[in-house]
Amino acid sequence: MEQAWNLHFYASLNRLKEKSQYREVVVTNQAEEPWLIRNGARMLNLASNNYLGLAGDSRLKEAAIEAIRTYGVGATASRLVVGNYSLYEEVEKSICDWKHTEKAMIVNSGYTANVGAISSLMGRHDVIFSDKLNHASIVDGVKLSGAKQKRYRHNDLHHLEQLLQTTPSEKRKLIVTDTVFSMEGDVAHLKELIALKEKYGALLMIDEAHASGIYGERGAGIAHVEPELSKKIDIHMGTFSKALGCYGAYLAGNEVCIDYMRNKMRSFIFTTALPPGVLATIQCAIAIVKEDEARRKRLLENGAYFRNVLKEAGYNIGNSSTHIVPVIVTSNEAAIRFSRKVQEAGIVAIAIRPPTVPHNSSRIRFTVTSEHTKSDLEWAIRQIVNIGKEEGFVE
């Protein structure tokens, strides 16, 4: 029996290798820095989600150490048992102040937040409208809910409305979207999505994982670029593991919606709570991003510079308008070759292939941070452009 299973595993892995979709993990150190250590070499880090450089911030480290001294290392239980430390209540109040919502709840990760929220809100008699390029956690949440799924073409509001029009009015409806799309670097049209959700009586849930801490008033997210919009969004989800440099995620909205999810969400109920040290770093990070406008501004400037120069050099960066800059090279083999070449040049940037992105859109996903210097980015661009010319990606 064991041999039969192993043969199945080997065959499956070999098929991935044949399609250039096999994945490996590589030991990396100092990934919280603009320059990291990988395979013993010092390399420029253009692959990290540490957008504001807070993962290595001394203030967050001290907050974690102090909380561990006070509360210990582990939460000891789920929040519904004895894991609901006072820190949870304090941080959730901070989130409400930051996001201007009635209530918030902290969840262990962005994945468990999306999977849990969507599957608790919707059921087999309901309909979910999901952008085709939404994150995998949204896709999995929709599947787990058992609801009928209607996927609309990426950022295509006309297609979304067509799908809404053909759905019986009595059906409960949820529209769900990323705000900053993690593999595209473009942004959802929230104002228009709000208009559609109001017209057709749907709930609207947004995933601010790659926007929280960066965009909008006090870094509260894309929903807060125009403050009046945020109050019209039913469920806000975001993570602390990217721009805030910590771990975990939040769900925020009105009081009854959050209370409902606390009572229905299996990924909240049946898991041990986050450690106190993590909660303390979240509290510290929120305080920093709310006030540190200069750090957010540096990130946006770095993103615009990197994006514009690569586009001018002839690279296909899609519709990116953020700090996430994909260079689309179509085939899996080309993406792997490109990634290998940039890493040989001293840059960490990873090939992204199906199923993470659609077929024939494999790419290198570059991400810049506020902590990259102009000289870092100038040097990287020279390497990337030279490689592109050598490999025929640009003329």
From Swiss-Prot:
CDD domains named in the record: KBL_like
Pathway(s) this gene product operates in, as recorded in its UniProt entry: Cofactor biosynthesis; biotin biosynthesis
Gene3D superfamilies on file: Aspartate Aminotransferase, domain 1 (3.90.1150.10), Type I PLP-dependent aspartate aminotransferase-like (Major domain) (3.40.640.10)
PROSITE patterns, per database record: AA_TRANSFER_CLASS_2
InterPro entries named in the record: Aminotrans_II_pyridoxalP_BS (IPR001917), Aminotransferase_I/II_large (IPR004839), AON_synthase_class-II (IPR050087), AONS_Archaea/Proteobacteria (IPR004723), PyrdxlP-dep_Trfase (IPR015424), PyrdxlP-dep_Trfase_major (IPR015421), PyrdxlP-dep_Trfase_small (IPR015422)
GO MF annotation: an example: 8-amino-7-oxononanoate synthase activity
Catalytic function, reaction form: 6-carboxyhexanoyl-[ACP] + L-alanine + H(+) = (8S)-8-amino-7-oxononanoate + holo-[ACP] + CO2
GO biological process, one term: biotin biosynthetic process
SUPFAM superfamilies: PLP-dependent transferases
Span of the signal peptide: none
Binding site for pyridoxal 5'-phosphate: 110-111, 182, 207-210, 239-242
A Pfam family assignment: Aminotran_1_2
UniProt EC number: 2.3.1.47
Assembly behavior: Homodimer.
Function statement: Catalyzes the decarboxylative condensation of pimeloyl-[acyl-carrier protein] and L-alanine to produce 8-amino-7-oxononanoate (AON), [acyl-carrier protein], and carbon dioxide.
Protein name stated in the entry: Putative 8-amino-7-oxononanoate synthase
Biological source species: Bacillus cytotoxicus (strain DSM 22905 / CIP 110041 / 391-98 / NVH 391-98)
